[in-house]
């Protein structure tokens, strides 16, 4: 894991114990093939909770004009699997993932779900080793660009702003997942022949998150 050590130290001034760091990169398919080897699922569980809390608190403090629904949509955009996996890809973390043979052949190191879980596991590892303050700083460093993008959406509702930019009638497709008592809504919208996704606890939140994703892409291209 020497490459990961160097990456964390160079970009985040962060060091982790070798054993804990390795565990953060062990997918369950690898541990299944290698006996009692511990995988990263518990760290991912913890990291997911830390990520959600840090982003929620940051948005609450810095976006006083946002309603509860807008806060939820912004958080959904930032912590979505797609967004977190994108950050992991930019850091080239997939190459360090320890996967089982089958998962590796299936291209696991490039899968959105596995990359998102990996980054959340890394957040969990920082939490375990160094506590909440260090984990918070790590999260804010990871998602800082996406937080900046969200801050630029405050003048207009993201769906309205996207409509103005594209000057087209946008159609949002929404699907639901999960049991009735715990529904998750996933929305998608096509802009310039590319599909953007978002999710939330309501149709509106999911649509706003999808609009935020599209806006972020459009504004990155124009900058």
From Swiss-Prot:
Reactions listed under catalytic activity = Endonucleolytic cleavage to 5'-phosphomonoester
HAMAP family given for it?
RNase_III (MF_00104)
Source organism: Tropheryma whipplei (strain Twist)
> A single Gene Ontology molecular function, please?
metal ion binding
Q: List where in the cell it is found.
A: Cytoplasm
Listed EC numbers: 3.1.26.3
What interactions and quaternary structure are annotated?
Homodimer.
Q: Which cofactor does it need?
A: Mg(2+)
The broad enzyme category this protein falls into is: hydrolase
Name it.
Ribonuclease 3
Instruction: Identify the Pfam families for this entry.
Output: dsrm, Ribonucleas_3_3
- Domain DRBM stretches: 157-220
What is the similarity comment for this entry? Belongs to the ribonuclease III family.
Annotated keywords? Cytoplasm, Endonuclease, Hydrolase, Magnesium, Metal-binding, mRNA processing, Nuclease, RNA-binding, rRNA processing, rRNA-binding, tRNA processing
Q: Which PROSITE patterns match?
A: DS_RBD, RNASE_3_1, RNASE_3_2
Active site (UniProt): 48, 120
Q: Which residues form the RNase III domain?
A: 1-131
Sites binding Mg(2+) sit at: 44, 117, 120
The reply to whether Magnesium figures as a keyword in the UniProt entry is yes
* GO CC terms in record: cytoplasm
Q: What GO biological process terms does the UniProt entry carry, in alphabetical order?
A: mRNA processing; regulation of gene expression; rRNA processing; tRNA processing
Which InterPro entries does its entry note?
dsRBD_dom (IPR014720), RNase_III (IPR011907), RNase_III_dom (IPR000999), RNase_III_sf (IPR036389)
Say what the protein does: Digests double-stranded RNA. Involved in the processing of primary rRNA transcript to yield the immediate precursors to the large and small rRNAs (23S and 16S). Processes some mRNAs, and tRNAs when they are encoded in the rRNA operon. Processes pre-crRNA and tracrRNA of type II CRISPR loci if present in the organism.
Respond yes or no to whether keyword Cell cycle is given for this record: no
Primary localisation category: cytoplasm
